[in-house]
């Protein structure tokens, strides 16, 4: 039974929002963007927001969130992303996804302090796009040396890919990362526990 400080849902709409409304008592700080196009996003937090912004960086129907909190006296910046994948039913090419990751990566490179990025990037960790994002942003992948943590597809036992990601700056140490049991989605939940190193400059 996990009790994360932040819980983020992707592909979420008003129906899901109502269906899990009982958790709102545990998460007093929230930002919702329910959509019916599979790109809705809901953020639940136990920690207060200093700033929270809903952004449409590349496509007008694909949101992302940028959040700032203060934790143990340090300003922490959080990004939550879910760009469209290249597919016959979505984008026929990868450019919007790649551009969004480049934009966020370049923004992170100019941002000081602790940073975490989490989301369904619709891309695997070893792809040129994801590797470029890590290089531009300078962020770390907590899965390296620990496994793939294949979160998609939860309903096909022989076809699984690590499409859900968490990246963090060197201001954090990994405590735990694990793929949780299926909750009925086509993605498994990915639980990541990070410890902020409070004396990191």
Residue ranges and their predicted role:
Residues 1-201:
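Soluble catalytic domains of enzymes that build or remodel membrane lipids, polysaccharides, and related
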């Amino acid at each position: 039974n996990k009790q994360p400080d932040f819980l983020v849902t992707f592909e979420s709409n008003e129906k899901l929002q109502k269906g899990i409304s009982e958790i709102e008592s545990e998460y007093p700080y929230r930002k919702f963007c329910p959509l019916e196009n599979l790109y809705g996003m809901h953020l639940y937090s136990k920690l207060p927001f200093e700033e929270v912004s809903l952004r449409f960086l590349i496509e007008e129907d694909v949101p992302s969130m940028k959040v700032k909190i203060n934790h143990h006296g340090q300003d922490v910046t959080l990004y939550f992303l879910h760009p469209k994948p290249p597919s016959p039913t979505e984008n026929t090419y990868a450019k919007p996804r790649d551009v969004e990751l480049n934009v966020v990566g370049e923004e992170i490179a100019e941002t000081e302090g602790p940073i975490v990025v989490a989301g369904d990037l619709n891309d695997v960790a070893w792809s040129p796009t994801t590797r470029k994002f890590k290089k531009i942003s300078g962020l770390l992948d907590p899965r390296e040396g620990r496994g793939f943590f294949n979160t998609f597809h939860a309903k096909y036992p022989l076809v699984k890919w690590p499409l859900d990601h968490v990246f963090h700056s060197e201001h954090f140490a990994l405590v735990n990362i694990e793929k949780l049991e299926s909750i009925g989605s086509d993605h498994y939940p990915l639980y990541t526990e990070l410890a902020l190193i409070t004396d990191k400059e």
